[in-house]
């Protein structure tokens, strides 16, 4: 069975990580894999909601979904964790360029994020992005 430092870090859990992750500066084995973008699929119906939980690959997924985001303007629920990627700010800025507003849910209310700050509360990892229409 394949075992990596990532499994050690997460006590047996295995997921993908971005090569520029911030997990205690540990080194990991890398593998080339074929990827498909969401834009490469032909969807027959309107897409109203997309959930993204890709352990640091959020920015790549969004870039590969640009046509869908522009055409359908779906609501996005994205798990973003600073320890998995250095592209957190780029992710927020990219969606802002596409006219998305960002929010987080504090357990009671939906709170609008006016701008991404490096010191954004780290206990919030699930962010909601809604297109301005």
Task: Describe each model-derived feature in a short phrase.
Residues 1-45:
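Glycine-rich adenosyl-binding loop in Rossmann-like folds that engage adenosine-containing cofactors
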Residues 37-133:
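Conserved acidic-Pro-Pro-aromatic motif
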